[in-house]
Design a protein with these regions (language model features):
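Aromatic (Trp/Tyr/Phe) and Gly/Pro-enriched flexible surface segments
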Residues: 1-244
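Proline- and Ser/Thr-rich low-complexity, intrinsically disordered segments
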Residues: 238-330
Length: 330
């Protein structure tokens, strides 16, 4: 559906109750950025946002091997995508760029979301070249940007060249094929979208600094020409931020430990020790006894919680030692 939702509504669909403050929302075009749902199919994401370097409406329905595999909306370029493409050994221009972007302020130190990559380059063109996409997270205070659209456990960008199965093109070996899911031309009646192939659902994640402004830019482009589109599907409600009180700790008797949410006083706080309410409505709490501590944080519809265990460092009395000196006296 590329007509019903405004850019703000699309972002709301991604965030749901993820407790972030959002601003400066922008999309390239509602022809290339839109809402989707799996419509009763077996597609692995129930609903969310699709961003395609072409017409998103060409993606719906079963796989059809015709002109809908390729389309062009614009001739825009993108410097960040071009750099990724160049670093992969490609030399032609990235064009037909589509994006969704917005600024946000997290309330925790972690940020993540789920996504799936699909492309019509799978099969015939998976050995030679690939379209490029990125999830560019920028710290607006430092200007430092990071691409979160990488193969899990690596720093390799997600592309058809880097996630492929040689079953569908024997001219090149498989690469990270455990992340490849489905090649639709081999089973058209069971296909869930009109694209040749797609990956499994992956998770993009990053450490962030609470109360610091960031920009996230979800962007995709065509390599070299407008032929054989690619798309990224982002799961609705998967943009999450979580509260982290830190790891479980062990403390000596008589010592204190400060648990800190790193949030400001505009939130409401309720602390618990072993399930019982303790403390005041404060962002931090001083622990002076072992136990299981948790906090519930609310602000409007935002709700966050975390739990940490504080153990007592048990010190046992040492065993008595005896020695016998059998040497000659001096």
């Amino acid at each position: 559906d590329n007509t019903t939702n405004t850019p703000a509504q699309l972002v709301d669909l991604l965030l749901v109750n993820s407790c972030v403050s959002v601003s400066n929302i922008a999309i390239s075009s509602n022809q290339s950025v839109a809402y989707f749902n799996k419509n009763g199919s077996t597609f692995p994401i129930n609903e969310g946002i699709i961003i395609r370097n072409g017409l998103v409406l060409n993606t719906q329905g079963n796989y059809v091997n015709n002109s809908t595999l390729s389309s062009q909306i614009n001739t825009n370029t993108d410097a960040y995508l071009q750099n990724i493409s160049n670093n992969s050994g490609q030399s032609s221009t990235i064009t037909d760029v589509a994006f969704l972007e917005f600024d946000f302020i997290p309330v925790s130190n972690s940020f993540s979301f789920d996504f799936l990559f699909a492309s019509n380059e799978y099969g015939e063109y998976q050995c030679g070249f690939s379209d490029v996409f990125a999830f560019v997270l920028t710290n607006l205070n430092t200007g430092v940007s990071t691409n979160l659209a990488v193969i899990p456990g690596t720093n390799m960008p997600v592309t058809v060249k880097d996630i492929r199965n040689k079953l569908y093109n024997t001219n090149c070996e498989s690469a990270n094929s455990n992340f490849f899911s489905t090649y639709n031309p081999t089973n058209i009646p069971a296909s869930t979208l009109n694209m040749r192939g797609h990956t499994v659902v992956m998770n993009a994640a990053s450490v962030v600094t609470p109360n610091v402004p960031y920009k996230i830019r979800l962007v995709i482009g065509d390599y070299n020409d407008s032929g054989y589109d690619s798309a990224v599907f982002i799961s609705g409600g998967s943009f999450t931020t979580s509260l982290d009180l830190g790891p479980d700790q062990t403390a000596c008797s008589g010592n204190t430990i400060q648990l800190n949410t790193q949030l400001d006083s505009s939130y409401t706080f309720q602390w618990f020790q072993n399930g019982n309410p303790v403390g005041g409505n404060t962002p931090s709490y001083i622990v002076n006894a072992p136990g299981t501590y948790s906090v519930e944080v609310t602000k409007g519809s935002c709700f966050l919680t975390d739990t940490v265990t504080i153990n007592d460092l048990a010190v046992t009395a040492p065993n008595n030692l005896q020695t016998c000196n059998t040497g000659a006296a001096n």
